[in-house]
Structures are given as structure tokens and as C-alpha cells.
Swiss-Prot record:
Record region (Disordered): 806-826, 927-955, 987-1015, 1040-1059
Gene Ontology terms describing biological process: defense response; meiotic cell cycle; meiotic spindle assembly; nuclear-transcribed mRNA catabolic process, nonsense-mediated decay; programmed cell death; regulation of defense response
Pfam families xrefs: EST1, EST1_DNA_bind
Quaternary organization: Interacts with EXA1.
Tissue expression from the record: Expressed in flowers and at lower levels in stems and leaves.
Function: Plays multiple roles in growth and development. Involved in nonsense-mediated mRNA decay (NMD). May provide a link to the mRNA degradation machinery to initiate NMD and serve as an adapter for UPF proteins function. Required for meiotic progression through anaphase II of pollen mother cells. May counteract cyclin-dependent kinase (CDK) activity at the end of meiosis. May play a role in plant defense through its involvement in NMD. Together with EXA1, helps to restrict cell death induction during pathogen infection in a salicylic acid- (SA) and reactive oxygen species- (ROS) independent manner.
Species of origin: Arabidopsis thaliana (Mouse-ear cress)
Phenotype of gene-disrupted mutants: Embryonic lethality when homozygous. No spontaneous lesions, but enhanced cell death independent of salicylic acid (SA) biosynthesis or reactive oxygen species (ROS) production during pathogen infection.
Compartment annotation: Cytoplasm, P-body
TPR repeats: 149-183, 184-217
Name of the protein described by the UniProt record: Nonsense-mediated mRNA decay factor SMG7
Amino acid sequence: MMTLQMDKTTASSSWERAKSIYDEIAELANKRQKAGNPPDPNLLQLLREKYEAIILESHTFSEQHNIEIPLWQLHYKRIEYFRLHINRVLASSTSTAAQNVKGPSKAEQIAQLKLQFRTFLSEATGFYHDMILKIRSKYGLPLGSFSEDQQSQNLSDKDGKELAEVQKALKSCHRCLIYLGDLARYKGMYAEGDSRSRQYASASSYYLQAASLWPASGNPHHQLAIVASYSRDEFVTTYRYFRSLAVEYPFPTARDNLIVAFDKNRQSYEKLFVPSKDSSKRLTGKGRGKGADISLKDATLVAGPEKDKVTIANEMLKAFSIRFVHLNGILFTRTSLETFFDVLASTSSSLREVISLGSAKELTLGIDTSDSALFIVRVVTMLIFSVHNSKKETEGQSYAEIVQRVEPARNSLTASFELLGLVIEKCVQLGDPSSSYFLPGVLVFVEWLACCPDIALGSDPDDRQTAVRNSFWNQFVVFFNQVLSLGPTFIDDVEDETCFSNMSLYDERETENRLALWEDYELRGFLPLLPAQTILNFSRKHSFGTEGPKEKKARIKRIFAAGKALTSVIKVDQNHVYFDSKKKKFLVGVKPADDFLDSHSSPPKACNALQDNQVMIDHNSPIMQLDQQIYMGEEDDDDEVIVFKPLVTEKRKEASDQIYVPSGGFRKSDQVTTMGDFKALSGSDVAFHENQILQARGNASIQVPASVGANLLGPLQPSTQSQAMHMQQVQTQVQVPASVGANLLGLLLTSTQSQAMHMQQVQTQAVNPQPAQSLAASRLQPIQSQVAQPLPSRVVHFQQTQAQVSHVSPAHSQSTSFGGGSKWSPEEAASLASSLSGFAQLGNGHVMRNEMQGNHGVSYYPAHSLPVHQSYNGNGMGGMPYSQSRTPEAVFPPKIDPVLSSGVVADGLGVQSSLAKKNPISRAFRHLGPPPGFNSVPAKLQKEPAPGSELSGNNHLPVDDYSWLDGYQAQSSRGVGLNSSLNYATSGKPEHLGSTGNGLNGPANFPFPGKQVPTSQVQADFPYFQNPQKDNFVDKNHQSTQLPEQYQGQSTWSSRHFV
């Protein structure tokens, strides 16, 4: 409490001191206005020191009053003063009269002004360097150069309050670096020769440091675009403007500058055509995409003299860049859309020629390998931005504006798949594509698709897009198989593809092993890729262009992980793509036999009871494969955490929208539409329970006097309407007479309409035996009274309570035959009744699972477990059934209730239909369901207590919980009820797996400018003080925003992502 009070006092005193300095600045500003121009240098120096004192004294006060903007304004006004005078001298009259005037010549005046200007810029550069050092010293940051590992280490050592202050300090350093870049850029504008290039390089270095310090800011990329425009590099200029817009805090001026840049590019694009009168007609004529412009190679030959290979490559690369920028300009401005396919054909042809210049080991694209790889990555990034910009949120737009987005969105996808298809095709042609400079770009593209499965799947594609998609995925499969054929070096322990659809499966420990590559650093903060970047570790040092085998192997692994994730949604000529884990090969239209066991270890050995009947079970059946898949990987749960290979139950927890159809693999719940699917499901479940029947033979010896069976089944007569039977079957070392099984199965087989049977199996102990007849009469009296009541919905709740039966004569055991001469033993009859427990019979005789929707809002098939014999436990542990080993409760996901058949053991623990586990103390079971005619309420699973007063002594009837009253529910069961109906949503294309997308639009809004800008316009510079309300970095709404060291938003690759 004392510390908190001291902190408040310190903050208050700092605020007051900053406020006092701010008042002094107001008085000095009035004096400066009265002084006029030129301003007094001493007064400027004093004002600058006052602003700096406020920033260092109270960062909160500084951000609230935007102190950094007027501080930069002091320097910028001085810069404008020198630029204005230099331009005036250059534009002054050159008449003889003016030259004869005594005094310094014009050249001397310009030289003197430039010297003064450079001196001022150098002094201002030193001031901002010193301020960065002071800020870092105050907040305990290292005084050396900025690096990712130092930042991560320092941020991890701070608590909540200190972390917020440090992040504010880093943002101040970020802005100071931008100001330093601007000062260096102005130096380069008035420098000569090599000095100009050095200053521009220095400015770019400052901007890149600022971008790495705060990747979510678009300001550094905007300034880098301005530097690129000085060298007339249209490709890099457009790339940087795109990056400036596709971040969490976009720079608004970039959109206007993009319009100017695209207008200049249009003029460059027109110069590529043959100078003829009909050249403009060929662009929009009938021969769309054919002959619109001359070939790049032909243009080189027409040029005349022979040129070396590098020069030719540079010219071809420049021509492709002009075409490619023009293509993106059409998509961005949505103008001249009728020429899009002509430009796309020209761009595609140009790219094919560019990437055909030698192999990956030679000079490529006219530059070295690392620069070639960077060029391809930027091509991919610009294509991704065009798709992202065309599919951004349409909130607040009119219907006409939304319709206008349809064609650009479709065209951007067509261009992306067509151009990247050429890159993949080139990778296939290489002998060893694992070391190709194309791979970084391929990684960026496939991870983006894995994070956006809706884009990978396609939404209403036209014929042209469908063709280019098929071509791309064909090359995609061939490329992957070619790399796989090189050996297992790159595919051992490939990360699971769930990282692109479920980021919640990853924690901080795992991000340490997710190696960030140079392309990840290059695209850090790029909004469409944030889900894939979320799980990457950016704390290590990196250097562009130098990577070893570790980085190459990591890149291949991530490409394969993305590829495996995409196999669930992509199609090649309407054929699904699968990955065969045994053959290490991607297959088209051929489903591998081990489709459900490709990423799991072999199952543990079964118990002796299971081994006795092992020969009767078909392990190759889909159901047994699914059962084994659920059971696998449980032996080492206590020793390690498996994240990249989660269990099926774990995947249900986070991705419960996928269900398994035995004849069709995994599908969405709304895709199980045909009766064939229901038949396959019914047959698979029946086959599963028949396996249990085989095991029950020889494992159960049960007998109950015939009177018990008569009393039990007396009220149950064949009904002409649906009957829902909830049964709790005793599992004891007693025997049931054949008459019980005969009556029960006769009831099941003679029902003329659907019967929904849900059985819950309880394990009890035989304590204080008593005559069976009195036991049945006392136990079944409440049930008979309930059955005798009116039945509005013809529902019969049948509950066989805890039986304490022993000393039964085996004389009652006899065999029973029924239905067609087939003979059934009592054991088979009892087991078959259990096997049909969780199913309802449809009107056409097909069996389906009942009460499976629960509170999840989705429909899914029940999970199965490997059939394991339950043995009687008499060790005083409360009658808890065990299989091989006792499994703790934590193995069950807390958010879902697996729907299991009665008697089925999941994860080694006997469970009921509803797993509302709350009390770790054992407690006896109690049926909470309502009487006939009321909605079904699932019983809560509560463990039985140790044998005590409840199970000893006299037989106490169950306490009435008043659940039979109309509208009444027990307190413990309210809100837990399951809907008894099972509805399957249908889909027009049941073979498709749906996706919710990843929602990567973020807070950025990109309204379409909708205008053509005259060629006389110039790109806007960076006058921070002229429009402070649009500054994203000093806006008080963003003051509390933390540095996005890791993406705080969602997951798709749904994600995380973020890769």
C-alpha cells in the first residue's frame, strides 16, 4: 500500500514538473513568433531542450500533449526554410544584369546555403541520437544498437506496469528513428554523387530499424517507399506502400501516394509497346492476351548490340516489374478492368522468361541468389495484398460498392494462382528444389493459404480461375513428391498442420522451437500473415542472405506442414488430395489405407480378456482403426505433452466441426446428408458393439431369478410409437436367466416404430444379499408407478437400480431361441441389449445415435474407444470400474462431453453419457431423468463414495428429487439437458470442408479512392505536424497499445498461427 502511494506521488510530481515546463514553452513560443524570420537560433535551442525535458520527465504527459510532434516541427520548419531559399536561388533570373550585380554568384550562394543546411541536419541528427540514448538509459534498455533478442530479454524481465512504460519508451525510440531517417534523406536530396547514395542508404537503415522496433506501424514502410521513388524503382515503391497499408496501424498518406505511383507506372507501361499507331488497339482488341506487346527476348534482340547475360536479365526483370506493378494497379484502383486479362497474360509470359534465366546455382534475375529470393518473396507479398485488399470488410459500404469488389477479388485470386503456378513449375524442373531461391516465396504463399482455407478452397470461381487452380495444385503435388523423393532428411518430425487452424494448442515453450527465417523478419507485421507468425520466435539474431542447413530444413518442414493442412480443403479436378504417411507421398484421388493412423504411434497391448478374442476382430476395419486412433498415445501422457500430434479427443475439443464417416473419411457435420452416410454410421457402430459381444462371451456369468426379469419387463410392452429406454445395467458376478434376455430382445425386435435406447452401466457391489423377489419388488415399485402414468410422448424410462443379488441358483439358466431359428445364449442377449443402447431406430429401420447434440450447437458422431473388459473391483475403491490402469480425470477435455455407448471405456476409464465432472469425491449414482412425458435430462456422472452408510444396512429407496414435476429440474441438472433430436445440416457440396476464415482484416480499413490522379501530382512527403490527427503513432487512442511482439489477434493457419 505504501509503495502504491509513493508511485502515485511520484507520478503526480512528474506530471506537475512537466506541466510547468510546458507553460514555459508557451511563453517562449510567443517570443519566437514576435521575432519573425529568420528565427533566433538560441531560442530554437532553448525550445528544443524544454521539449526534451518534458519527454524525459513524464511520458504520460508527453503522449497526452503530443510533445514529439511540435519538437519535430521545430526542425522541419527550419528544413523548409533552407529548401525554400535554395530553390529560390536556383530559380532566380540568369540575365546578364543579374549576373553583373556585385556580390557572390548564384553558385556560391547555393553552395553556402547547402553547407548551412547540412550543418543544421547533422546537428539535428546528433540531438535525436542523444535523446534515444537518454530514453533507453532512463528505462533500463541497452545502450547499444537495437536488436530483437535484447528487446525480448528486457521486456520479459519487466512486470505489468514497467512493461507498459518500456513499451512507450520503445515507441518514442521508434519515432526518433523515423526522424533520423528523414534527416538523412534530406541530406541525400542535396548531396552529390556517391554521397547521395550513402545518405539514402543511411535513411533506409533508420527506417528498417524503426520497422523492426514496432512492426505494427506503417510509417517506416511509407518512408521507405519515398526513398525507393527517388531511384524510380516502381516495384519496391509499390511493395512498400502496400506494406504501409497492410499493418495494424496503416499510414493513411500511402493510399494517395499509391495513386500517384500507379499513374506514373501507366506511362512506363505504355512505353513497352512497339511504337505503332495500332499499338493501343492491340491491348483491347479481339486477340486478348496475344500480341499485345512484343516479346521481352525480341525486344532485347531489336535493341541492337550484343549484351551480356546480366544486362539482359536486368532489362527483362525491369520490364516484368513494370507489367507486374501495372497489374496490381488495375486491381487496386479498379480502373481499366477490361484490360486485366491482357495485362495478366503479358505479365505471366514475362515472368516465365525471367525465371528461366539459368538454374538456382547461377546468377538469377540479374542479381545474386539472396536478392533473387527477396524479389520472389516481394512478388508473392504483393499478390497476397491484392487479394487481401479486395476481400477486406465491406461494413458501411453500399451494395454497388460491394458488387464492384467481386470482379477485382476474383481477378486477384486468378493472378495469384497463375503466377505462383509458374514458380512452382520452375521448382519442379530443378534437380534439387530444396535449395532453390524460390522456396522462401513458396513458403509465404502456402502458409498464407493454410491460414486462409476459404481462399484455398475458393468461393464461386469462374472457369478461368478453376483452370489455374487445378494447374497450380497439380504442380503443387508434383513439387512436394519430388522433394519427398530426395529422402527423409526434411520430413522427419514434421510439425503438425494444426498450427494453421488452431493457435490455442501452442504455448510459450513451443514458440522457442519455431525458427523465424529471414522471410519472416522481412514480412513481420504483414497483416495477412500474422496468424502464421504468431508461433514464431523472433528473439534470435539474423542476417539476410546467410543461412545454413538448419534454416533450409526448417523451411521445408514448414512447407510440408502447410501442405498437409491444405490437403483437407484442396481439390485437383474434383479429386481430393491425401498424404500417405507410409509411402511419404501426396496422392490425388486415392485415399491411403492408413488415413487415420498416419500420425499416431502403435496402440498399447490389450489386456488378457481382449487377447482371448483378438482373432475375431478385424483390425483393418475403419471402426477399429478409429478406435485405435483414439486410444493411441495415452501411455506417455504423464511424461510428455504432445502438441503437434494431438489425440482425437483433443482435436474434438478445438475442432469439433469435423466428424468421421466410415465410408467417407472426416467431414463437416453439415455434410452428412445422404442415407448412405447414415447406413455406414449405423453399420459401423453395430459392428463395434458386436465386437463387444464377442468379448462378453466367457467374461460374464450373470444370473437373476426369473421373477426379477418378469418384474422388470412387465410394464414394457411393444409400443406402436417411439420408446426411449434409459437403463442402468448391473455389472456383478451374477447370472441373468435366459427369459430376461429373451423378453428384452423380443421387445427390441418387435417394435414397429423407432426405439431410442440409452443405457447407462453402473458397477455395484454385492453387499448384504437378500431374496431376489423382495429386492425387485422394493426397487422397481417407483418405476412401475411412473410407467403407469399417462405417456404423452410414449417414452418409457427404464432404470435397473443398484442390485445387491447373490446366492442365485444356476437352475434358471437356459438357452432361448428367437427370430428365424437363430440361437442366442443369455450372455449374447445381454450384450446385444447393451450394444444397442445409444441408438434410435429410424422409420426406415436404420439406426442412428440419439442425444448427441448437447450444448455444443453442432452434430457429430460418437467417439469410440478400444473395447476393454471391465473387471470387478473389490479393493474398496468405491466400485470404480477400471480397465488396464487408472486414468485421472484430467484426460477428458473440460469443454465437451464425449458421447459414448454404455459399457464403452474411453481413455481407460468407464464413463457415462454426460461427463459433468465437478466433485472429485466419489458419490453414488442417481438417475435425475424426468418421468415419461417430460424432456430428457442427462444424469450427471458422480463417482461413488467408499462403502458406507448409503450402501450398507437396509435397502433405502432413492430420495425423490421431484424431477417428475412439470417444469421442475433439480438444481444440479439445470441447463445441462441435451436435445434429444439429432439434426444434420446439409450442404450443397458435402465433400467440401467449410471454414470460417481467419478474419485477417484487423482494424485497417482501405476505402477505395475511386479516382484517377493527373500525372502532374507528386507523392506526398512527411509533414508530421500538418495533419496530426491522422498520425497513427501519437494518437492518444493508441497510446496504451502494446508493441505487437507476438500477434495478439486470432488464429486460422485458424489460425497461428500467425505462423
